[in-house]
């Protein structure tokens, strides 16, 4: 069995970064501070696929300002100073150490561009567990048009590079992109994880093979199947 991890959501907690970008996008507006969403309110909306435009409306902005705020967040969310807000989930190192001890092949496939990924690898010292060949991402400067298609290409590239069989590989992701692209690439199992940018309820609609809350549950399920 081989394991493929999406990055943001399963491995990286991006909620602080997205919330900081939300707050930044409201600066200069004349809205009442009491209308600004708490992080919990904001993240619940994000997880349930409420658009950035709608979130701005809920925060008291008018239509035009909401459009500007939503557009600004597309850039703000990926600026270096905001990427610093990212956190590694507590169970990641322990999970990677376990997989290495069991000699289980695992790798990361993400729609981050190379520069953003390199920043995170250095920030969280992930090169202790994975070499450069185990990260698959988007080239700097490349504009992603179709998330599912782009991720599918990366998933197939990983199979080819490692000479792995898709049916023996499981993908762990937190979005519809991960689930649909995993199925398109004919990965053996598709696991939805509910701590990322989609809620448990949203993931249930997609009918993944398994739905988990954390990586410990992934290990438990995979160990049970392997045995």
Locate predicted features.
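Short phosphate-binding/catalytic loops that engage adenosine nucleotides
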Residues: 63, 104, 208
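Short acidic-hydrophobic, aromatic-tinged amphipathic segments that line or gate anion-handling sites
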Residues: 136-137, 210-214
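N-terminal helical cap/lid subdomain that shapes the substrate entry/recognition surface
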Residues: 1-90
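Short, acidic loop-to-helix structural element flanking the phosphoryl-transfer center
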Residues: 80-108, 114-118, 152
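Short beta->alpha linker loops
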Residues: 87-91, 112, 174, 195-198, ...
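Substrate-recognition "cap/lid" segment bordering the active-site pocket of phosphatases
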Residues: 114-169, 180, 184, 202
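Acidic, Mg2+-coordinating phosphoryl-transfer loop and its flanking beta/alpha structural elements
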Residues: 170-210
């Amino acid at each position: 069995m081989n394991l493929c991890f999406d990055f943001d959501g399963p491995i990286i907690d991006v909620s602080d970064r997205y919330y900081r970008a939300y707050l930044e996008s409201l600066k200069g507006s004349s809205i009442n501070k009491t209308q600004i969403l708490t992080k919990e309110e904001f993240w619940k909306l994000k997880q349930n696929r409420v658009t950035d435009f709608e979130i701005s409306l809920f925060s008291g902005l008018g239509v035009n300002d909401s459009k500007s705020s939503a557009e600004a967040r597309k850039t703000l969310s990926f600026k270096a100073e905001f990427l610093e807000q990212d956190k590694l989930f507590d169970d990641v190192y322990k999970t990677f150490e376990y997989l290495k001890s069991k000699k289980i092949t695992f790798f990361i496939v993400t729609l981050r561009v190379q520069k953003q990924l390199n920043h995170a690898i250095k920030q969280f010292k992930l090169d202790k567990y994975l070499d450069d060949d185990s990260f698959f991402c988007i080239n700097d400067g490349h504009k992603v048009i179709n998330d599912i298609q782009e991720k599918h290409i990366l998933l197939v590239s990983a199979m080819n590079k490692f000479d792995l069989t898709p049916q023996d590989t499981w993908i762990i992701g937190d979005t519809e992109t991960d689930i649909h692209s995993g199925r398109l690439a004919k990965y053996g199992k598709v696991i939805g994880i509910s701590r990322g940018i989609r809620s448990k309820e949203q993931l249930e609609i997609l009918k993944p093979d398994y739905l988990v809350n954390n990586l410990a549950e992934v290990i438990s399920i995979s160990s049970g199947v392997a045995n």
